[in-house]
């Protein structure tokens, strides 16, 4: 009788372990967040950056993203140009428990609110391509924090580059 109970218990345990679980995929999930950090550009100095972004989970591994970044450049003179960029892109993410590394490609528009400094490779307005990487940490299903590194290059001039490093926080919903 004891042997039968043991076999039944082990069999029930194995069946429970083999049963399908609910997936925690993130397709159709919305993200809304912001970030603060620094920006650096060719011919410009390290300066503050502020960003806002939205993302939508196309699948459990791909997000569509829209990002707006404001940069307050300081060039060591009275002329301190501010810049805005709006980028749209697709990111591939690798969900690993609470840590989510990701990488994305972007295309968008870069605009200096004032004319860029003389001798700078930047135009006042330009189309840009970008590459971004990040590491997010899920505090909860709804809240996350992370770090983002993004490199943008203006299409009109190959040496017109910009680099952002941001600490981010986001709210998620809609799964």
Tell where the protein language model's regions lie, with residue ranges.
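Transmembrane beta-strand segments of Gram-negative outer membrane beta-barrel proteins
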Residues: 24-40, 101
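Cleavable N-terminal export/targeting peptides
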Residues: 1-28, 175
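Solvent-exposed loop/turn segments connecting transmembrane beta-strands
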Residues: 39-48, 75-81, 97, 155-162
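Extracytoplasmic loops and strand-loop junctions of Gram-negative outer membrane beta-barrel proteins
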Residues: 34-38, 114-118, 150-153
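Gram-negative (and chloroplast) outer-membrane scaffold detector with strong preference
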Residues: 53-132, 137-143, 165-175
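Short secondary-structure boundary/capping segments within folded domains
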Residues: 24, 41-44, 53-57
